[in-house]
């Protein structure tokens, strides 16, 4: 089974373009057939035009977020008192995802800023159940991602066991786990064993080398030659998000694809 790679435009081509629309064009020009994007606040029409112009697949969209609030800039799904905001952000993101034919939304959790963790868990679970119903009506999937404390200190969703417990409580087949191997290695190590343990829950993958989050072929803790073969054996046939920080420039770093025996 051939692996398929999508350019994460929060990380790639940022040195050449500030707008998401222009990054989409650059990704297409450099061989990517799919992209992952944040909710494009203020440029939705331009992004829709760029997607139609290039024909790229939008494989993942991040939930809209509030840039003006330190706690909510990483999402609102788990944050008590933000339920109304979450629903409006969810509706806006689903509407945008429809326009670009994207079937998958990353339901970002937000930051834990004190109080009772049980309140965050209750809010998160309730909001994910709401999301499951809304996404199902649009034939979409929602994913949740455990993120390590070095990348985003205080992020609520910070372990695979916590994610598994939440998903069990939500009990919706269209709310799944996003396995970012960069975060997974930081959080738990033993990537292949952890993936096998949570295999049934995973609906999306992202990649980057550890510890510096560069390209997969850069020297680091993970052997991506082995990892990619494991993903093929895993049977995953969706897009794999390239959510890494280019060591030099995006284009100069794309040699990893052919070096590891793949194509875009």
Curated annotation (Swiss-Prot):
Entry keyword set: Isomerase
Single biological process term from Gene Ontology: glyoxylate metabolic process
Active site per the UniProt annotation: 145, 243
UniProt key word Isomerase: yes
Gene Ontology terms: cellular component: extracellular region
Catalytic activity: 3-hydroxypyruvate = 2-hydroxy-3-oxopropanoate
Annotated signal sequence range: none
EC number(s) stated in the UniProt entry for this protein: 5.3.1.22
GO MF terms held by the record: hydroxypyruvate isomerase activity
Top-level EC class as recorded in UniProt: isomerase
Keyword Isomerase tagged: yes
Family label: Belongs to the hyi family.
Role according to the record: Catalyzes the reversible isomerization between hydroxypyruvate and 2-hydroxy-3-oxopropanoate (also termed tartronate semialdehyde).
Name assigned to this protein: Putative hydroxypyruvate isomerase
Organism of this sequence: Drosophila melanogaster
Gene for this chain: Gip
């Amino acid at each position: 089974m051939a692996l398929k790679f999508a350019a994460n435009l929060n990380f790639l081509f940022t040195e050449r373009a500030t707008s998401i629309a222009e990054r989409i064009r650059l990704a297409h020009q450099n061989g990517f057939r799919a992209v992952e994007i944040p909710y494009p606040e203020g440029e939705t029409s331009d992004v829709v035009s760029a997607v139609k112009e290039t024909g790229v697949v939008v494989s993942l969209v991040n939930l809209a977020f509030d840039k003006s609030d330190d706690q909510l800039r990483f999402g609102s799904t788990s944050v008590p008192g933000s339920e109304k905001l979450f629903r409006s952000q969810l509706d806006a993101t689903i509407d945008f995802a429809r326009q670009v034919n994207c079937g998958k939304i990353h339901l970002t959790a937000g930051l834990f800023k004190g109080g009772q963790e049980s309140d965050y868990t209750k809010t998160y679970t309730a909001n994910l159940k709401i999301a499951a119903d809304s996404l199902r009506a649009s034939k979409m999937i929602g994913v949740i991602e455990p993120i390590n404390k070095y990348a985003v200190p205080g992020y609520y969703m910070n372990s695979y066991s916590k994610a598994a417990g939440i998903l069990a409580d939500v009990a919706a087949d269209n709310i799944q786990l996003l396995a970012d191997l960069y975060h997974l290695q930081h959080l738990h190590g033993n990537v292949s064993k952890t993936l096998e343990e949570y295999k049934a829950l995973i609906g999306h993958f992202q990649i980057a080398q550890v510890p510096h989050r560069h390209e997969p072929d850069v020297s680091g803790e993970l052997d991506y030659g082995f990892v990619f073969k494991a993903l093929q054996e895993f049977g995953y046939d969706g897009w794999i998000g390239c959510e890494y920080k280019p060591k030099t420039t995006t284009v100069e770093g794309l040699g990893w694809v052919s070096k590891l025996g793949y194509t875009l």
